[in-house]
């Protein structure tokens, strides 16, 4: 067995769930929704992804969670820390 293939269980960096625009209610526990618009897909952990019928499709995740995912932008730019 000389084949080394990545299993699909292992999330790659790009498929990690993330959200830049997250809105939460003030209830306990909070009800949070990611309002990011993505093209053709939602983040990897999204259970209820709603897309427009346009091309490319604009998709938003309709899940309600009690937390927000990491922001998508932060992983790529470290420039924000230098201010």
UniProtKB/Swiss-Prot annotation:
Which residue numbers mark the site Reactive bond for chymotrypsin?
53-54
Task: List the Gene Ontology MF annotations in alphabetical order.
Answer: serine-type endopeptidase inhibitor activity
Feature type site, description Reactive bond for trypsin: 26-27
Which residue spans adopt a coiled-coil conformation according to this UniProt entry? Answer: none
Asked whether the UniProt record includes Disulfide bond among its keywords, one would answer yes
Disulfide bond as UniProt keyword: yes
Q: Name one GO cellular component term.
A: extracellular region
Which Pfam families does the record associate with it?
Bowman-Birk_leg
Further remarks about this protein from its record: Several variants were isolated from a commercial Lima bean preparation. Some lacked 8, 12, or 14 N-terminal residues and 2 C-terminal residues.
* Family statement drawn from the similarity comment of this UniProt entry: Belongs to the Bowman-Birk serine protease inhibitor family.
Record-given protein name = Bowman-Birk type proteinase inhibitor
